[in-house]
Amino acid sequence: LEVHDGGRKNNVLHVTEVMARPASSGPEWIEISNPNHFAVALKGWSLNHTSGSTSTNLLMQSGVLSGQSLSLLTGDPSSQVVGNATHVVDLGSKGFLGVGQLDGLDNNQGVLSLRYTQLDETTPSDVARIQWGGGTELFLITGESLVWDGSDRFDESAWAIQDDPTPGDYDG
């Protein structure tokens, strides 16, 4: 598998759906789309979750997302519904996403950022940002997810509550 343009400044991955309040003791999950025709190496990519004064970071150090693929980052791969996802990545073992009563993402309010750090730099740049609860109008109840409408990756109005989550089935 060749990875092209892995170090360029305008890498694009899209966070397309987020499950922060799973039902029936299910796993939290983040759906990521690679819309490019080339694979993207995960080295240099990171996730950040902030809620109140608490912040959690996860730097990905290996892995590749194939071109035009859909990936699920999950708190528990064994209980995750995967739909048409090409890749399923366990972030529960890394302590970033939870399952059941163990929360990685705050149920009530939070900010989730997908970030990329250039190989010669130390500071990551946000590639996408999702916010719920707090000052937003996005208040989740158990079993609802947040889904991206395909527009601005930083605008909270680009996100809506989904009553029937669709892990691994983004068609944008």
Language-model segments: which ranges?
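Intrinsically disordered, low-complexity linkers and terminal tails enriched in Ser/Thr/Pro/Gly
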Residues: 1-172
